[in-house]
Structures are given as structure tokens and as C-alpha cells.
Amino acid sequence: MIKLSRLIFLIVLFYVFLDSSGQFYNGHKMRFGKNRVQYSDFYWEFYRYDKFDIYFNQFGKELAQYTADFTRREIPRLERFFNYNLDKRIIFIVFNKLSDFRQSNIGLITGQDEYNIGGVTTISRNKVFIYFEGDYIKFEQQITAAIARVLINEILYGFELKDNVTNSTLINLPEWYFEGLVSYVSKGWNFKIENKVKDGILNKRYKKFNRLIGEDAVIAGHSFWKYIADTYGESVIPSIIYLTRINKNSNSCFLYALGFSLKQLSYDWMSYYLDLYKDAQHHQSLPEADRILKRPRRKRVYQQISISPDGKHISYVTNESGQYKIWLYNSETNKKKKIIKREHKLEQITDYSYPVLAWHPSGRILTFITEEEGGIRLYYYTLATKDLEVRNFQYFEKILDYSFSDDGSLFVFSGIKKGKTDIFVHTIASGTYQQITDDYADDFNPEFINNSEEIVFSSNRYSDTIGSEINNRRKALSHDLFIYDYKNGDNVLTRLSQDRYSSYYQPYELDKNRFFVLGDKSGIINRYVSRFDSTISYVDTVVHYRYYAKSYPATDYPRNIIEHDYNQKAGKLGEIVFNDGRYYMYNQPTDEALIRAGKIEPTWFRKAFTKKIAERDSIENIRRKDLSIQSIQDNTIITSDLDTFVFGDYQIDINNYIFEKEKINYYNSKLKDRNITLSLDTAEKGRPKIRIYQTAFYQNYIVNQVDFSFLNESYQAFTGGAVYFNPGMNLLFKIGTNDLFDDYKVTGGIRLSPDFNSNEYLISVENLKKRLDKQIVFHRQSFKNTGEDEGEEFTVKTHTHELSFIFRYPFDQVRSWVRTLTFRSDRTVFLATDINYLGKANIYKTWAGIKVEYIFDNTRSLGINLPNGTRYKFFGELYQQVNGGFDDLAVLGVDFRHYIKIHRNLIWANRFAASTSQGSSKLVYY
């Protein structure tokens, strides 16, 4: 340990005293930057409502309409929650999937990073983007989060420019405060949130509350705001936010609003959840002997576990900050092998929806579906030859899950098409597909069962009839299992009803009429063995059956099972459980998985959730019943008094009993048989006309700061002095504007020195709409410097005018090829400091140049001036004087930097930089 400390000390000492004469340009302020790659052309349209606009591309009309309908209901609710009315119109930008958003330029910072972030004011806070993941519940949560974000920003920072400039420079909120509040408002409390809160509380990861970052900060903040709401009431939250704006501080606002300091509240918050979860460990312990990996990495998310038909191999996916890898684990040798690695670790929203894995029934081929270059690709990996075959999978926006038929000629999948998540069957030989469902219900986890004659899947559909219009208007409050008769193509699904307000996912056929499923019946997502059965419902001319499912718990874990997989041929089951901040994978034989766990007591949240959802369901049924009766009265033409239908006139038929929830539909059908009705389609009522988006610019940011650097990188003209001129203290002002999608950006800047002798002006215009990014930069710089000629000092003022055309071609998000064409004019003026220089002629030089760069940059920001990762560039430049002289200059250089995080706010930075020049006007390096 002592030797290691000495080694680190010597390395630090070496770097401290290392000569830095290899600096060029502005030294450390080299231009790097990440990219957005456009693979598709999007044409944007929008709906305009009173309080919001919704922009969508040519493939997203259905999503935009769903967004509009939900937003019209949600804005008034959130305005009541925050006790604040929106002053600024919300601009929604709807993407069909996250991969489409990654092609956009929204949020992209081009050029060099801001090294001096003081005085930077962001203006636009009302523009939000949302994307569809295949689950409308998550989509609605995104919409709610977007509205809440805009409302909170307006309360804190105001909506006028003067308020933004004043408040944004003074209010700096921790991540747990802002993002935690947005998460609480948008997601409420659910089984997945509680699972992570419980894990963080019991494993003491949230002990240092104010030091949390990333997901831990969001989840801890979410639970903190729930504690505030449960203890003091939700009505205090708007007061806390308002006091935050007044006091410009996130600590004192709690003291003024609640009478307790944030420190005291954090203790009370921790005690509150420790008391709730004190009995949480009274469950089966997680299996220790069946772990696939003894200690998985904390930063990695493990998912898509899949067991091969022979039981020898287990495939799974790891995802770390957006970079995913597919692994093959040999259960006989306990060795793992990486098949592919895709994408990079970047500071962006991670898409966990792909890749999706499935084994071919032969056991010799592992297949997986990914999203690449804006499209969907299906890969076949042959274990024997290690060959990788790829096919494009067209006509779908996203594939969420899939599985093969017994003979491997078909696979059934859950896919997104036109904003709807439905079930499809794909024929591999012909490349065609058959659509099974087509509605707004969310259909997940399809599997072939019963010798591939039927398909079981999980869905929140209200009606069990395919094509029923009610599934487009109403969804169930939980997910049930449904069976589709694929052999006969029956449009009536078989619903495997269990508990009314419990959800069941990921069904796998154990044997005939028995399944492994995941369910949240107890408040913790455990595995159940579900048996499908039927009983006689009633008899008329034929026997009618009612189908149901009975289940018993096979696990009683203290944490949720995130996902599981069962292979009937192998007789093995795999599962992933999140515990102690890690994702643990397990592999069990069937006989162990079938052991009954005993009776599971529901958690406190399960009881509260069931009560709340039952009340909501009852109110919704009453509301819809009233609407249905009113609709009959409004839309029915009564032909005679005798046609009037009285509900009480009908007797109960014991052979055809009508349940309460079906009564109103039954009566409606009776009325329709006896009356002429006018069906009024009100779906489009009140929908504004579609408008075409025209490019318009919005003010984006303002910079007002004291600075010590130049606006633009540029070689300085040599004036005979031995000093590289630095501008010293100066006043910097920059303003940026861009269009709605950040495709076009205009930036203007001015730097003024105190003596007005060394000033600088810059204007930049960028076009990022296509894959080839284009930029025009005009830069004017003047500086005063001294020189020496034959022992006599003189003073010169140099004026440089530079026009650059920059073309940037991105290979992916981190690699790019940059070419720059430059025209430059230097004018050197000798100041009349004495008689010798009074009549000395000015020197004019005009240059034409070209610069080529290869740039790699995968750094992530851990904070202000705290990068983590690697960035480097290779560059070459060639300049030629074009105004009569024959001076030329050629430059080659490299700049390599690697940043390593060694503590929360401490990094180890390594840099290697080198440059050389050739020609008649060589560079002078200082």
C-alpha cells in the first residue's frame, strides 16, 4: 500500500513539473463534441390547442392524437395540484420511439464545451419531447412528467425573460428535489418504485441523501416527496416550491413551510420508511446456490435472460450507460462469452427495450433483434460456426418481445405499428406477417402453446373480442392473460381471469393448461404456477363455458422478480432479481421452481393500492353508465311510446345471467334492436386542423460573464514578439437562437477588453438537419502586441478576419470526420510610437486553407468541468498565401485525453498532445 502511494505521488509530481511547451491553439480548449446521426427524413406537422402544441412526424398522427386527448385532461389536473395556471404554451414534440429522438438535434451542444459556465442563462423551458415505448401507461407518465416539469419551471423561474435571467442564476436545485418531484407527480407509487425504494432504504444506499446522483437521486427524491405528501398533505407541495423561488434555496423552504429543517426531515423520512419495511425481510431468502454470476457489476443492468433448449447455454444482455453486450454463458463450464458489443457509454436516455433475445427450437441458433441506423435488424448467431447473419425487419417501429413456434418456422411477436402495440405472427420463409390484434390495448409477452396451435399473451384489454371498439376507448386497470386460438382464428379470446386488480405477465407453458407467470398479487412481483380450467356457465342450445385460472405462489422473495424465462425442453427456469443495487441472475431446475411457497401476506401498499383502484373502478363504471344512458337518450329517435324501454320490465334469465358490468351493454343492445339510432362519432369533435411546420427561430440562451479566453480557436499572426497573446480579463456576451428542432442554430458573440484594443466578434450559422452538418463562421479578432526588431521595441495591432466553412460527417454518435475550408485576412498595423514607425507600411496577408480532422469523443459529464471517458483527435492543416506571396504552412497534430473518475467529484485527467509544422511560415510553439 505504501509503495502504491509513493508511485501515485511521483506521478503527480512528474505531471506538476512537466514542461507544457507543446501547447497549440488555446491549449486545453480544443474542439471535440459528440454527434447526432440522421438516417431518416422527418416531415413535421402539428396540432394547436389553447395551452399546448403537439408536433409529430408523418408516422406519428395516432400518437399525437392520443397525446392531445390525454393532455387536455391532464393539464387542468396538474394546475389544480400545483395551484398554478400555465402562462406559457407547452410545446410537445412526439417521437414514435427513442431511436427516432436520437436522430434529432434537440439538446445537442455542438462545438467545444463551455469551460466558463458562469452567467449562462437558458431561455427555453417550455419545449418537451416524449417518445413511445410500447406501453401507454408509461407514455401517459411521460406526458404528465413533461407538463409537471414545465409547471415547476414556471413557478421557480418565471416565464418572462427578465425572470429567467434573474432566477436561473440564483436557484440551483439538487437532483433529488427537482427530478424526484417530477417522478412523484408523474408516476405516483407503484410496485416497481416501491421495490427500488425498499432496496435503497434497507441497504442504506440513501443514507447520504444530498450526495445521491442519477437514478438513486430520482428514486430517493420520489420517496421523499411521497413522505411529505403522506405526512403533511399534498397541498403543502406548491407552497414549498413557491418558497424555494422566494428564498432561492432548497433547504430553507422546508423550514418555512413545515417548521422543520431539511436535515430533520431527512431523518424523519428515513425512519418513516424503515418502519414501513421493518417486516419486509420476513420472506423466503433469495437462492444463493443457483446464481449464474456470483457478483454482478453494480453499474450494469442485466436483462433478457434466455435458456437454450438443451439447457447448456444461457444468453443474457448487459447494459451499462447505453452500451449493451450480448453474452453466452455455459452452465457446464461456468464460463461466459461475449457475442457482440454495440453503442457507446453516453450521457443520454438509455433504451432498455432492445436487444430482444430468443432461442431457435433447434438449440443451435440464438436470434436477437436490435435497432440500428433507424431501423430494426434480426440477427441469427450460429453456435457451431460463430457466424452472424443479419436481416432487415421492416414495417414496424419496434419489436418488444418474440418467441418461436415448435418447428421454428414461425415466431409470434409483440410489435408497435402506427402507435399501437399488437400481436403479430411472422413467417420466416416468406418474410410475411399476420396481424392478430389491432387496437389500443397493450399486448405483451406472446408465446406459442399447445403444440403451437394457440398463443398466450398478457394484455390490459377491456373486451375479450378482437376488433371490439371498446378496446380503443377503455383499458382494464390490470393485465390479464389471454389465449388466442391461432389454429382456427377465433376472434373471441379466452380470458384467464384471476384476481380483479392484480396483473400477470410473462407466461410460459409448463405443461398442458399450466403456466409459470409473474404477478403482483402480494405487492411484490413473484412467480406463480397458474392452472387454466373451465366450468359450465349456462346451457341453452349448446353448453357455454366460463374459463378461469387458479394459481399458487412458487416464490416469496423480498424483492421483485424483474423477468424470468422457462424452456420446456430443457426443463430449466431462469430469473433476474434486483437486490442491493445489483441485478442477480438465477438458474433453477423445474422441480425446484414448482415448490409451493405457502401463503403470502399482501404488503401495506398492495392493500392500499387495491382499495384505491377499486374506488377508481367503481367511480369510472358509474360515470360511463351515466354517459351511456345519456347517449341513448340523446341519439335515439323514438318511433312510438310503446318503443320506450324500461329497465325494470326485464326479468332475470337464470340460464343467461347478465353480470353487473355487462348490464348496460346488454340493455343498449336491446334498445338498438327496437329503435332507430343515430350513432354520433365524436372522436374528431374539437380536433383542430393539422398545420405544417414552418421553420421559426427561438431565443435559446444568453451568456454574460467575465472571461479570460478567446471566442474562437485560431492561429495568431506572428508579430516578432516572444509571447502568445492572451486576452486577459474581458467582458463576454453571447446570444444563441435556434429553430424548434435545433436543426438550425445562429450564435453571435462579442468580447470586449477593458482598453478596447483587443476585441473580438463572432457569428456562426449551423445547419444540422441532414447527416452532413454544415456551419459557416465569421470571426474578427484584433489584439495589440509588442515586438522587437534589431534591439528596438515596437507595438503593433493585428486585425484578423476569418471566414470558415465547416462540414462534419458523423459515423456514429462519438466518431466524426470534419473538414474546414478557411479564408483569412491578416492586417498588421505598426503603431506610431516613435518617428521610425510613423510611416511604416502595414502588412497584409490573405490565406486560403483546408483542415481535416478525425474526432472521437465518448466523454460524459460528472459535473462542471468533470468529464469522464476518452476523447481524441487527429488533424492536418494546409494554408497557402494567395495575395502575391508564396508563404505556406502545413500542420499535423494529435490530441489524446483520458479522464478517470476516482471519487465523487474528483477525476484523474491524462493528456498527450503533439503537433509539428512544415513550410515557409512555420508555427511557433510557446
What are the residue ranges of the model-derived segments?
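Outer-membrane beta-barrel translocator/channel fold
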Residues: 463-467, 471, 560, 772-819, ...
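Juxtacatalytic substrate-recognition/specificity segment
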Residues: 22-167, 174, 191-192, 253
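Outer-membrane beta-barrel initiation region
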Residues: 639-771, 844-866
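Active-site-proximal alpha-helical
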Residues: 78, 173-193, 198-260
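Blade-terminus and WD-like Trp-Asp/Gly-His loop motifs, strongest in beta-propeller folds
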Residues: 305-313, 357-365, 402-410, 446-454, ...
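A flexible loop/linker signature enriched in serine peptidases of the S9 family
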Residues: 195, 199, 298-300, 317-327, ...
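Beta/coil-rich, acidic/histidine-enriched accessory regions frequently appended to metallopeptidases
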Residues: 25-28, 35, 46, 246-346, ...
